[in-house]
């Protein structure tokens, strides 16, 4: 490992027939290499919850796979620090233009730049969709129906939960009965107990949060030590990110993963794509492929499709419907904060150890469509100081409030937003370091969002007050997970991809990430993205076996 002029360590590189082993200090694993001019079955752009999972499952099905990612390949045991500022290296901080009535804040909790994508810094909350959300128009009267059946998705949820060894409660209080989680639930910290006391006082159910972080040993990975820096990268590998789960499996099965490889444009000839142009090590390359999968998430996926416009596809690839970039959904993430009489020390452990989904499953007593859950919180000190500064606290006032840090508690929602065509991603006039137009992200809340926010604040305030909190205040303009922009559906006129995540326009172009969501639900999306990726891999194998997909499995 080399260092730059400041003494900062450069990340290890996947090259020369080997890949960094994230589970061993200084470790390496053998990795198959492909030539750029050697057509592989699949080139995948992105290695997060969608692309990393799909790379693993396709390679295990016997296909030749090259996965490209703009981010670095880290070994968490030696390269992740207990330092919020240092770990900003995991975020996608490239320039984007954000406008609209409610411009989004991008670059931290809703995007990632690393092998493993944003799963490297996600909060590990792993929740299934409510079954009715897959047919929200038919069953609940809003949004659109998915082209997927919830019972099939339930099987893939189980596959992902087993693959990640999700730690969760013996019985989950909402939805259809399900098997026990693979690992026991984590011990609750004091912040989670605040949520529990408040929910019980309100007479609503709560539960320990199902988390993709280990509560017991798994091979060379240690269980969670309650270090508390989960959203800044897990230094012990307890977090079951794509970096330490799907990616090592993909490499072992014969996939090549190329780090620091920025996709520039997808090449198309007629009604087929032929590969991906990308920038790596100061040179532009072209990887030939029989199929291209885009898995760059809800901003970079539509951006790449739009950047790849040509004479035959002047609006961008897969965009005959004109819907690429449209129907962006940013889940609501408002919070109620308060001060407790006793110390909470909310930084101890994963940030969301308890939750309630009561308002996801209760359809009465609401003046809005959709639902939300709320979770216990544990912001780190710098993040908390930023929140206080945003309230206008500076100087001595900020110091006094920070002195109460260990006595704080809070609840935060993940709330469903409705798909609106005007919330969208387009290309701006400004250009990035590669000379490409940056993404313009236009976003606005609607009346349904505002009604949900008011309802959530009223309920969370009741819960905090019942738990003994005082000096309650609101963080009222925040969003989290992104979805939509390349929606799936049953009609090529109203969607971009079909149920198998395959472009309606170009049969060897696939999209596999949260951008395919027609609706977003009121829970974290990572489990659903990974379940869709597992399903897509199986569907590709089925389609290829009957000659409907251009790929040839080779058992290694």
Model-predicted segments: where are they?
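FAD cofactor-binding and catalytic pocket of flavoenzymes
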Residues: 104-109, 146-150, 321-442, 447, ...
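Extreme N-terminal leader/targeting segments of oxidoreductases
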Residues: 2-42, 60-61, 542-556
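A glycine-rich dinucleotide-binding beta-alpha-beta segment and adjacent secondary-structure elements
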Residues: 208-215, 219, 223-232, 237, ...
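N-terminal Rossmann-like FAD-binding beta1-loop-alpha1 element of flavoenzymes
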Residues: 42-67
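A conserved FAD-binding loop/helix module that cradles the flavin
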Residues: 519-538
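Glycine-rich loop(s) and the adjacent beta-strand/alpha-helix scaffold that form part
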Residues: 57-60, 64, 71-81, 236, ...
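Redox-cofactor-proximal catalytic regions of oxidoreductases
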Residues: 85-174, 234, 345-348, 414, ...
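Conserved redox-cofactor binding core of oxidoreductases
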Residues: 137-263, 481, 487
